[in-house]
From Swiss-Prot:
Positions annotated to bind ATP: G18, S19, G20, K21, G22, T23, R132, G177
Domain notes: Consists of three domains, a large central CORE domain and two small peripheral domains, NMPbind and LID, which undergo movements during catalysis. The LID domain closes over the site of phosphoryl transfer upon ATP binding. Assembling and dissambling the active center during each catalytic cycle provides an effective means to prevent ATP hydrolysis.
Lineage: Eukaryota, Metazoa, Chordata, Craniata, Vertebrata
Keyword Kinase: yes
Keywords: Acetylation, ATP-binding, Cytoplasm, Disease variant, Hereditary hemolytic anemia, Kinase, Nucleotide-binding, Phosphoprotein, Transferase
Identification of the protein by name: Adenylate kinase isoenzyme 1
Associated clinical condition: Anemia, congenital, non-spherocytic hemolytic, 3: An autosomal recessive disease characterized by hemolytic anemia and undetectable erythrocyte adenylate kinase activity.
Quaternary data: Monomer.
Provenance organism: Homo sapiens
Gene Ontology terms: cellular component: cytoplasm; cytosol; extracellular exosome; outer dense fiber
Binding site for AMP: T39, R44, Q65, L66, V67, G94, Y95, P96, R97, Q101, R138, R149
Family matches, as PANTHER family: NUCLEOTIDE KINASE
GO BP field: ADP biosynthetic process; AMP metabolic process; ATP metabolic process; nucleobase-containing small molecule interconversion; nucleoside triphosphate biosynthetic process
Amino acid sequence: MEEKLKKTKIIFVVGGPGSGKGTQCEKIVQKYGYTHLSTGDLLRSEVSSGSARGKKLSEIMEKGQLVPLETVLDMLRDAMVAKVNTSKGFLIDGYPREVQQGEEFERRIGQPTLLLYVDAGPETMTQRLLKRGETSGRVDDNEETIKKRLETYYKATEPVIAFYEKRGIVRKVNAEGSVDSVFSQVCTHLDALK
């Protein structure tokens, strides 16, 4: 299992809340057969399970704080091990949020092949999130929480991008345009991996 994980393509997908990274991940799954693992989805399903861990996570998320690293890594690892035999690769969505998370991931799981940076401006992200909040029922899609989430995101993510840029594995896509125009940029980067 360990060896298989180390040989598998692992792509970190980083982008702010509302950047459209989730949508891009869905399209990558359809076209390339990767497995999409969103730390947010893993956490939310844990919360809705009503487990003790889920209740703790719920309190943390409602305050707009980040969930402990150990918890996230355990959940990611379990999900990857479950799929390693059938997947063409993994999209790790919303991770790492800080350099230490990336280093810990590499120690415990494997090295990323690429970091895909889905980059949209704060106004665009806010508008998309407010629109999503009308229909999603998510506790964290309101204006005040969005502002906090964006601040948290920028503060945490800039050092991560810088860290992986030194290794030459960051690929940035401009996420201001339509879903398809963003995806064509994504495909250019993924096709280069083959």
